[in-house]
Amino acid sequence: MAAYVSTEDKPLGDNLPNKAVFQSYIWTCAKYDFNVYEKRIIYRLVEFAQRWLEGVRIKDHMHKVEPTNCGVNITMPVADILRDEDDHNYTKAKAAFTSLSKKGATYEDDNIWFYTAIIEHPKIEKNTGIAIFHVYEPVWRAALDFTKGYRKYELITAMKFKSVYSMRFYELLSGQIKPLYVPLEGPDGLRERFGLQTKYERVNDFKRKVLDIAKKELDEYSPYSFVAK
């Protein structure tokens, strides 16, 4: 599969400022299988990490980063991971925080391999709609590590996507000027990166369930897209 950048300008679809965030290439290339709500939690972590690096003090009581001996505690509104959605009794949020606390991410390059859990001890205060959870130190460190490069993308655009595969492609393609070739199979292939080693094993199924859906959303919301060959 080859992904080629499209540079045509497209409207964002709303009047909100589209804040740029810088995501460590470690996170961009990490191998994991998250759903959309879990991915939105990660996007918020990236946003928190950027503000931390910039030395921007978060002034409201609804957003906090509190260092601990083994990571950081994050406080944020549950609404930060929703897409203008109704979440009765926090059902979607509880499911997302619970499932993400049971998952991890893998990163590997020529020098290192590591696996880490992501978060633990998520809590939602029902009266205020505030979520509090702990982020493991390797995850926070990876979010702050730009030594291997970074991807710059627009946060509101990323939060628009309904498919997690659209999100992953958007991260990979954002800021890409030259054509980017990403194979389907292999250690750096899409199947491995997206954690789909046992799903959509037939190429046509992978194209229909992953590539076609991602391309449709990218064409609608993003200035970047790809073609599959």
Residue ranges of predicted features:
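Charged, alpha-helix-forming regions
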Residues: M1-K229
